[in-house]
Amino acid sequence: MTLLELTVGPVAHGGHCVARHEGRVVFVRHTLPGERVLARLTEAEPDARFWRADAVEVLEPSPDRVPSPWPEAGPGGVGGGELGHVALAAQRRWKATVVAEQLHRLARLDREVVVEAAPGETDGLGWRTRIELTTDDAGRPGMHRYRSEEVVPLSAMPLAVSGIVDLDIFGRRWPAAVRLTAVAPVGGDRPLVLVDGVPWSGDGPDRRPNARTSVRERAVLATTEYSWRVAAAGFWQVHRTGPTALGTAVLDAVGPRDGATVLDLYAGAGLFTLPLADVVGPSGRVVAVEGDPGAVRDARRNAHDRPQVELHLGGVTEVLGQDVVAHPDVVVLDPPRVGAGREVVERLVAMRPERVVYVACDPAALARDVAYLGQRGYPLTGLRAFDLFPMTHHVECVATFDR
Protein backbone atom coordinates (compact mmCIF):
# COMPACT_ATOMS: atom_id res chain seq x y z
CA MET A 1 0.00 0.00 0.00
CA THR A 2 1.56 3.27 -1.14
CA LEU A 3 0.78 6.31 1.00
CA LEU A 4 1.38 9.90 -0.02
CA GLU A 5 1.20 12.99 2.13
CA LEU A 6 -0.77 15.52 0.08
CA THR A 7 -2.03 19.06 0.40
CA VAL A 8 -5.46 19.04 -1.21
CA GLY A 9 -6.54 21.59 -3.79
CA PRO A 10 -9.90 22.40 -5.42
CA VAL A 11 -12.87 20.11 -6.02
CA ALA A 12 -13.22 18.33 -9.36
CA HIS A 13 -16.12 16.77 -11.23
CA GLY A 14 -16.78 13.23 -10.03
CA GLY A 15 -16.49 13.55 -6.26
CA HIS A 16 -12.73 14.12 -6.11
CA CYS A 17 -10.42 16.89 -5.06
CA VAL A 18 -7.25 17.71 -6.97
CA ALA A 19 -3.81 17.35 -5.42
CA ARG A 20 -0.34 17.19 -6.94
CA HIS A 21 2.60 14.93 -6.24
CA GLU A 22 5.91 15.66 -7.94
CA GLY A 23 4.05 17.45 -10.75
CA ARG A 24 1.48 14.70 -11.32
CA VAL A 25 -2.23 15.27 -10.74
CA VAL A 26 -3.77 13.02 -8.08
CA PHE A 27 -7.57 12.82 -7.81
CA VAL A 28 -8.33 12.23 -4.14
CA ARG A 29 -11.63 11.05 -2.68
CA HIS A 30 -12.87 11.44 0.91
CA THR A 31 -11.13 14.76 1.46
CA LEU A 32 -11.83 18.50 1.23
CA PRO A 33 -10.02 21.50 -0.26
CA GLY A 34 -7.28 22.82 2.00
CA GLU A 35 -6.79 19.61 3.96
CA ARG A 36 -3.48 17.87 4.47
CA VAL A 37 -3.96 14.10 4.30
CA LEU A 38 -2.30 10.75 4.01
CA ALA A 39 -3.74 9.22 0.85
CA ARG A 40 -3.58 5.60 -0.29
CA LEU A 41 -3.01 5.26 -4.03
CA THR A 42 -5.75 3.19 -5.68
CA GLU A 43 -4.75 3.64 -9.33
CA ALA A 44 -1.15 4.60 -10.04
CA GLU A 45 0.27 3.31 -13.30
CA PRO A 46 3.78 4.77 -13.71
CA ASP A 47 3.05 6.28 -17.13
CA ALA A 48 -0.51 7.46 -16.34
CA ARG A 49 -1.34 11.15 -16.74
CA PHE A 50 -2.99 11.14 -13.32
CA TRP A 51 -3.36 8.92 -10.30
CA ARG A 52 -6.31 8.18 -8.01
CA ALA A 53 -6.21 7.95 -4.24
CA ASP A 54 -8.35 7.73 -1.10
CA ALA A 55 -7.62 9.93 1.90
CA VAL A 56 -7.17 7.46 4.78
CA GLU A 57 -5.85 9.81 7.48
CA VAL A 58 -6.56 13.51 7.92
CA LEU A 59 -3.56 15.45 9.23
CA GLU A 60 -5.11 18.93 8.99
CA PRO A 61 -8.92 18.88 8.66
CA SER A 62 -11.16 21.37 6.93
CA PRO A 63 -13.73 23.19 9.08
CA ASP A 64 -16.34 21.65 6.75
CA ARG A 65 -15.40 18.08 7.74
CA VAL A 66 -17.98 16.11 9.76
CA PRO A 67 -18.27 12.44 10.81
CA SER A 68 -19.78 10.42 7.97
CA PRO A 69 -23.25 8.98 8.67
CA TRP A 70 -22.32 6.02 6.45
CA PRO A 71 -18.80 4.74 7.22
CA GLU A 72 -19.25 1.77 4.86
CA ALA A 73 -19.09 4.29 1.99
CA GLY A 74 -15.82 5.74 3.28
CA PRO A 75 -12.26 5.07 2.03
CA GLY A 76 -12.02 1.62 0.48
CA GLY A 77 -15.76 1.12 0.80
CA VAL A 78 -18.77 1.18 -1.49
CA GLY A 79 -19.75 3.99 -3.81
CA GLY A 80 -22.82 6.13 -3.33
CA GLY A 81 -21.84 8.13 -0.25
CA GLU A 82 -18.56 9.78 -1.20
CA LEU A 83 -19.42 13.18 0.32
CA GLY A 84 -20.64 11.87 3.67
CA HIS A 85 -17.66 13.51 5.39
CA VAL A 86 -18.71 16.97 4.16
CA ALA A 87 -21.17 19.23 6.01
CA LEU A 88 -24.43 19.45 4.07
CA ALA A 89 -24.15 23.17 3.26
CA ALA A 90 -20.59 22.60 2.08
CA GLN A 91 -21.75 19.70 -0.11
CA ARG A 92 -24.01 22.15 -1.95
CA ARG A 93 -21.22 24.68 -2.33
CA TRP A 94 -19.02 21.85 -3.66
CA LYS A 95 -21.62 20.96 -6.30
CA ALA A 96 -22.19 24.61 -7.22
CA THR A 97 -18.45 25.00 -7.76
CA VAL A 98 -18.38 21.96 -10.05
CA VAL A 99 -21.34 23.17 -12.16
CA ALA A 100 -19.79 26.64 -12.50
CA GLU A 101 -16.36 25.20 -13.35
CA GLN A 102 -17.78 22.93 -16.06
CA LEU A 103 -19.71 25.84 -17.60
CA HIS A 104 -16.53 27.92 -17.60
CA ARG A 105 -14.32 25.18 -19.01
CA LEU A 106 -16.63 23.67 -21.64
CA ALA A 107 -19.06 26.49 -22.50
CA ARG A 108 -16.85 29.52 -21.82
CA LEU A 109 -19.55 30.94 -19.53
CA ASP A 110 -18.96 32.54 -16.16
CA ARG A 111 -22.08 32.12 -14.08
CA GLU A 112 -22.77 32.10 -10.37
CA VAL A 113 -24.49 28.86 -9.36
CA VAL A 114 -26.51 28.16 -6.23
CA VAL A 115 -27.52 24.58 -5.45
CA GLU A 116 -30.95 24.44 -3.81
CA ALA A 117 -31.96 21.88 -1.21
CA ALA A 118 -34.78 19.53 -2.16
CA PRO A 119 -38.14 20.42 -0.61
CA GLY A 120 -38.31 19.16 2.96
CA GLU A 121 -34.63 18.20 3.08
CA THR A 122 -33.05 18.58 6.53
CA ASP A 123 -30.12 16.24 7.17
CA GLY A 124 -29.41 14.61 3.80
CA LEU A 125 -30.55 11.17 4.99
CA GLY A 126 -33.61 9.01 4.38
CA TRP A 127 -34.32 10.30 0.87
CA ARG A 128 -33.83 7.35 -1.49
CA THR A 129 -37.12 5.72 -2.53
CA ARG A 130 -35.28 3.14 -4.64
CA ILE A 131 -32.12 1.19 -3.91
CA GLU A 132 -30.21 -1.40 -5.92
CA LEU A 133 -28.22 -4.05 -4.07
CA THR A 134 -26.27 -7.18 -4.97
CA THR A 135 -25.92 -10.26 -2.79
CA ASP A 136 -22.61 -12.00 -2.22
CA ASP A 137 -22.00 -15.74 -2.39
CA ALA A 138 -23.46 -16.13 1.10
CA GLY A 139 -26.65 -14.26 0.21
CA ARG A 140 -25.75 -11.13 2.19
CA PRO A 141 -27.02 -7.91 0.58
CA GLY A 142 -24.46 -5.26 -0.25
CA MET A 143 -22.98 -3.02 -2.90
CA HIS A 144 -19.89 -3.09 -5.06
CA ARG A 145 -16.71 -1.69 -3.65
CA TYR A 146 -15.94 1.56 -5.50
CA ARG A 147 -14.51 0.80 -8.98
CA SER A 148 -14.58 -2.94 -8.23
CA GLU A 149 -16.73 -6.01 -8.84
CA GLU A 150 -16.30 -7.14 -5.23
CA VAL A 151 -19.54 -7.11 -3.22
CA VAL A 152 -19.24 -5.52 0.22
CA PRO A 153 -21.99 -6.74 2.62
CA LEU A 154 -23.84 -3.85 4.25
CA SER A 155 -25.53 -3.53 7.61
CA ALA A 156 -27.61 -0.46 6.75
CA MET A 157 -28.45 2.11 4.09
CA PRO A 158 -28.90 5.49 5.81
CA LEU A 159 -29.90 7.19 2.56
CA ALA A 160 -33.02 5.00 2.16
CA VAL A 161 -36.50 6.16 3.15
CA SER A 162 -38.14 4.56 6.18
CA GLY A 163 -40.37 2.40 3.97
CA ILE A 164 -37.27 0.60 2.70
CA VAL A 165 -35.62 0.45 6.13
CA ASP A 166 -38.74 -1.24 7.50
CA LEU A 167 -38.34 -4.08 4.98
CA ASP A 168 -35.30 -5.25 7.01
CA ILE A 169 -33.44 -6.19 3.84
CA PHE A 170 -30.06 -6.19 5.61
CA GLY A 171 -31.26 -8.45 8.42
CA ARG A 172 -32.12 -11.31 6.05
CA ARG A 173 -30.30 -13.78 3.84
CA TRP A 174 -31.23 -13.87 0.17
CA PRO A 175 -30.33 -16.09 -2.79
CA ALA A 176 -26.65 -15.80 -3.64
CA ALA A 177 -25.36 -13.50 -6.38
CA VAL A 178 -28.68 -11.83 -7.25
CA ARG A 179 -29.76 -8.25 -7.84
CA LEU A 180 -32.12 -6.79 -5.24
CA THR A 181 -34.33 -3.82 -6.07
CA ALA A 182 -36.31 -2.21 -3.26
CA VAL A 183 -38.88 0.50 -3.97
CA ALA A 184 -40.93 2.51 -1.47
CA PRO A 185 -42.99 4.94 -3.56
CA VAL A 186 -44.16 8.34 -2.36
CA GLY A 187 -47.86 8.54 -1.63
CA GLY A 188 -48.78 5.43 0.30
CA ASP A 189 -48.32 2.55 -2.16
CA ARG A 190 -46.83 -0.54 -0.49
CA PRO A 191 -43.06 -1.05 -0.85
CA LEU A 192 -41.93 -3.70 -3.29
CA VAL A 193 -38.86 -5.94 -3.55
CA LEU A 194 -37.67 -7.53 -6.78
CA VAL A 195 -35.04 -10.28 -6.94
CA ASP A 196 -33.45 -10.37 -10.38
CA GLY A 197 -36.55 -8.55 -11.61
CA VAL A 198 -39.04 -11.01 -10.06
CA PRO A 199 -41.40 -9.79 -7.29
CA TRP A 200 -40.55 -11.25 -3.88
CA SER A 201 -43.17 -12.11 -1.30
CA GLY A 202 -42.24 -13.43 2.13
CA ASP A 203 -39.46 -15.95 1.63
CA GLY A 204 -39.77 -16.64 -2.08
CA PRO A 205 -40.55 -15.35 -5.55
CA ASP A 206 -44.11 -14.37 -6.40
CA ARG A 207 -44.60 -15.93 -9.83
CA ARG A 208 -48.32 -15.32 -10.13
CA PRO A 209 -49.30 -13.82 -13.51
CA ASN A 210 -50.80 -10.80 -11.72
CA ALA A 211 -47.94 -10.29 -9.27
CA ARG A 212 -47.25 -6.61 -8.72
CA THR A 213 -44.24 -5.29 -10.65
CA SER A 214 -45.10 -1.58 -10.69
CA VAL A 215 -45.82 1.11 -8.12
CA ARG A 216 -47.89 4.28 -7.98
CA GLU A 217 -45.87 7.47 -7.48
CA ARG A 218 -47.46 10.77 -6.45
CA ALA A 219 -46.31 14.40 -6.36
CA VAL A 220 -47.92 17.82 -6.01
CA LEU A 221 -46.93 20.40 -8.64
CA ALA A 222 -48.32 23.87 -7.98
CA THR A 223 -51.67 22.92 -6.44
CA THR A 224 -52.31 19.78 -8.49
CA GLU A 225 -51.60 16.25 -7.29
CA TYR A 226 -50.32 13.97 -10.03
CA SER A 227 -50.12 10.19 -10.03
CA TRP A 228 -47.93 7.99 -12.21
CA ARG A 229 -47.74 4.24 -12.59
CA VAL A 230 -44.06 3.31 -12.88
CA ALA A 231 -42.35 -0.07 -13.28
CA ALA A 232 -40.49 -0.91 -10.09
CA ALA A 233 -37.42 -1.74 -12.16
CA GLY A 234 -37.85 1.33 -14.38
CA PHE A 235 -36.40 4.81 -14.14
CA TRP A 236 -37.82 7.36 -11.71
CA GLN A 237 -36.36 10.21 -9.70
CA VAL A 238 -35.15 8.52 -6.52
CA HIS A 239 -35.30 11.45 -4.09
CA ARG A 240 -38.63 11.44 -2.28
CA THR A 241 -39.28 15.07 -3.30
CA GLY A 242 -37.29 15.00 -6.54
CA PRO A 243 -40.34 14.84 -8.82
CA THR A 244 -41.82 17.87 -7.06
CA ALA A 245 -38.58 19.86 -7.26
CA LEU A 246 -37.85 19.12 -10.91
CA GLY A 247 -41.47 19.18 -12.07
CA THR A 248 -42.04 22.58 -10.50
CA ALA A 249 -38.79 23.95 -11.94
CA VAL A 250 -39.66 22.69 -15.43
CA LEU A 251 -43.16 24.17 -15.32
CA ASP A 252 -41.76 27.49 -14.10
CA ALA A 253 -39.27 27.49 -16.98
CA VAL A 254 -41.89 26.55 -19.58
CA GLY A 255 -44.28 29.24 -18.37
CA PRO A 256 -47.94 29.71 -19.40
CA ARG A 257 -48.47 27.93 -22.73
CA ASP A 258 -52.20 27.53 -23.31
CA GLY A 259 -52.74 26.08 -26.79
CA ALA A 260 -49.01 25.59 -27.42
CA THR A 261 -47.13 22.60 -28.84
CA VAL A 262 -44.50 21.15 -26.50
CA LEU A 263 -42.01 18.44 -27.43
CA ASP A 264 -41.07 16.24 -24.44
CA LEU A 265 -37.89 14.28 -25.21
CA TYR A 266 -36.62 11.33 -23.14
CA ALA A 267 -40.07 11.42 -21.55
CA GLY A 268 -39.86 8.21 -19.51
CA ALA A 269 -43.11 7.28 -17.79
CA GLY A 270 -44.41 10.83 -18.17
CA LEU A 271 -43.06 12.76 -15.17
CA PHE A 272 -43.20 16.01 -17.15
CA THR A 273 -45.66 14.87 -19.83
CA LEU A 274 -48.71 14.94 -17.57
CA PRO A 275 -48.24 18.43 -16.11
CA LEU A 276 -47.19 19.76 -19.53
CA ALA A 277 -50.48 18.46 -20.95
CA ASP A 278 -52.32 20.51 -18.35
CA VAL A 279 -50.20 23.58 -19.14
CA VAL A 280 -51.06 23.50 -22.87
CA GLY A 281 -54.68 22.57 -22.19
CA PRO A 282 -57.12 20.69 -24.44
CA SER A 283 -56.32 22.91 -27.44
CA GLY A 284 -52.58 22.31 -27.12
CA ARG A 285 -50.35 19.37 -27.97
CA VAL A 286 -47.63 17.48 -26.12
CA VAL A 287 -45.49 15.15 -28.22
CA ALA A 288 -43.56 12.78 -25.95
CA VAL A 289 -40.64 10.67 -27.19
CA GLU A 290 -39.11 7.76 -25.25
CA GLY A 291 -36.93 4.84 -26.30
CA ASP A 292 -37.78 2.33 -23.56
CA PRO A 293 -40.87 0.21 -24.39
CA GLY A 294 -41.75 -0.39 -20.74
CA ALA A 295 -41.64 3.32 -19.94
CA VAL A 296 -43.85 4.07 -22.95
CA ARG A 297 -46.39 1.47 -21.77
CA ASP A 298 -46.47 3.18 -18.38
CA ALA A 299 -46.75 6.60 -20.02
CA ARG A 300 -49.74 5.46 -22.10
CA ARG A 301 -51.55 4.40 -18.95
CA ASN A 302 -50.59 7.58 -17.13
CA ALA A 303 -51.75 9.88 -19.95
CA HIS A 304 -54.84 7.92 -20.99
CA ASP A 305 -57.18 10.77 -20.01
CA ARG A 306 -55.21 13.49 -21.80
CA PRO A 307 -55.98 13.31 -25.53
CA GLN A 308 -53.58 16.19 -26.26
CA VAL A 309 -50.66 13.82 -25.53
CA GLU A 310 -49.00 11.88 -28.38
CA LEU A 311 -46.50 9.18 -27.43
CA HIS A 312 -43.75 7.98 -29.76
CA LEU A 313 -41.58 4.94 -29.05
CA GLY A 314 -38.06 5.18 -30.41
CA GLY A 315 -34.69 6.84 -30.08
CA VAL A 316 -34.83 10.62 -29.97
CA THR A 317 -32.63 11.09 -33.03
CA GLU A 318 -34.67 8.54 -34.98
CA VAL A 319 -38.06 10.00 -34.05
CA LEU A 320 -37.00 13.60 -34.66
CA GLY A 321 -35.98 12.52 -38.15
CA GLN A 322 -39.59 11.49 -38.82
CA ASP A 323 -40.93 15.05 -38.53
CA VAL A 324 -43.39 14.13 -35.78
CA VAL A 325 -43.69 17.84 -35.05
CA ALA A 326 -42.49 20.62 -37.32
CA HIS A 327 -42.31 23.71 -35.13
CA PRO A 328 -42.81 23.16 -31.39
CA ASP A 329 -43.15 26.23 -29.23
CA VAL A 330 -41.11 24.65 -26.44
CA VAL A 331 -38.83 21.63 -26.20
CA VAL A 332 -38.33 19.91 -22.84
CA LEU A 333 -35.61 17.27 -22.67
CA ASP A 334 -34.27 15.09 -19.86
CA PRO A 335 -31.48 13.07 -21.49
CA PRO A 336 -29.43 10.32 -19.84
CA ARG A 337 -26.14 11.07 -18.10
CA VAL A 338 -24.24 11.38 -21.40
CA GLY A 339 -26.41 14.35 -22.38
CA ALA A 340 -28.20 15.10 -25.63
CA GLY A 341 -25.13 15.52 -27.82
CA ARG A 342 -24.44 17.42 -31.00
CA GLU A 343 -26.78 15.52 -33.35
CA VAL A 344 -29.84 15.86 -31.12
CA VAL A 345 -29.08 19.55 -30.52
CA GLU A 346 -28.80 20.18 -34.26
CA ARG A 347 -32.12 18.47 -34.98
CA LEU A 348 -33.71 20.32 -32.10
CA VAL A 349 -32.61 23.83 -33.13
CA ALA A 350 -33.61 23.13 -36.74
CA MET A 351 -37.23 23.11 -35.49
CA ARG A 352 -36.73 26.66 -34.14
CA PRO A 353 -38.62 26.42 -30.85
CA GLU A 354 -39.00 29.61 -28.85
CA ARG A 355 -37.58 27.99 -25.73
CA VAL A 356 -35.63 24.90 -24.70
CA VAL A 357 -35.82 23.54 -21.14
CA TYR A 358 -33.05 21.04 -20.41
CA VAL A 359 -32.96 18.77 -17.33
CA ALA A 360 -29.45 17.48 -16.69
CA CYS A 361 -27.90 15.06 -14.22
CA ASP A 362 -24.27 15.54 -15.30
CA PRO A 363 -22.63 19.00 -15.21
CA ALA A 364 -20.03 18.17 -17.86
CA ALA A 365 -22.61 16.87 -20.37
CA LEU A 366 -24.81 19.88 -19.67
CA ALA A 367 -21.96 22.33 -20.19
CA ARG A 368 -21.03 20.71 -23.51
CA ASP A 369 -24.63 20.99 -24.71
CA VAL A 370 -24.86 24.57 -23.41
CA ALA A 371 -21.99 25.34 -25.77
CA TYR A 372 -23.68 23.57 -28.70
CA LEU A 373 -26.97 25.40 -28.12
CA GLY A 374 -25.26 28.76 -27.67
CA GLN A 375 -23.36 28.36 -30.93
CA ARG A 376 -26.67 27.76 -32.71
CA GLY A 377 -28.53 30.79 -31.41
CA TYR A 378 -29.89 29.50 -28.10
CA PRO A 379 -28.02 31.20 -25.25
CA LEU A 380 -28.43 30.06 -21.68
CA THR A 381 -30.99 32.36 -20.05
CA GLY A 382 -31.78 30.53 -16.81
CA LEU A 383 -30.23 27.88 -14.58
CA ARG A 384 -31.33 26.20 -11.36
CA ALA A 385 -29.48 23.41 -9.59
CA PHE A 386 -30.89 20.98 -7.03
CA ASP A 387 -29.29 18.74 -4.43
CA LEU A 388 -31.36 15.64 -5.10
CA PHE A 389 -28.52 13.26 -4.16
CA PRO A 390 -27.19 14.35 -0.74
CA MET A 391 -24.00 12.66 0.45
CA THR A 392 -22.96 12.09 -3.19
CA HIS A 393 -21.38 14.33 -5.82
CA HIS A 394 -24.42 14.15 -8.11
CA VAL A 395 -26.48 17.26 -8.85
CA GLU A 396 -29.53 17.95 -11.03
CA CYS A 397 -29.89 21.10 -13.13
CA VAL A 398 -32.75 22.71 -15.03
CA ALA A 399 -31.43 25.02 -17.76
CA THR A 400 -33.44 27.38 -19.96
CA PHE A 401 -32.45 28.57 -23.44
CA ASP A 402 -34.26 31.16 -25.56
CA ARG A 403 -34.02 31.84 -29.28
Task: Go through each PLM region and give its residues.
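Short beta-strand-to-turn element immediately C-terminal to the catalytic PLP-Schiff-base lysine
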Residues: 135, 401-402
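Accessory RNA-recognition modules of RNA-modification enzymes
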Residues: 1-333, 338-346, 352
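Short hydrophobic/aromatic beta-strand or adjacent loop that forms the aromatic wall/cage
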Residues: 128-130, 394-398
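Conserved hydrophobic/aromatic beta-strand scaffold that supports enzyme active sites
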Residues: 18, 398-400
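S-adenosylmethionine
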Residues: 312-395, 402
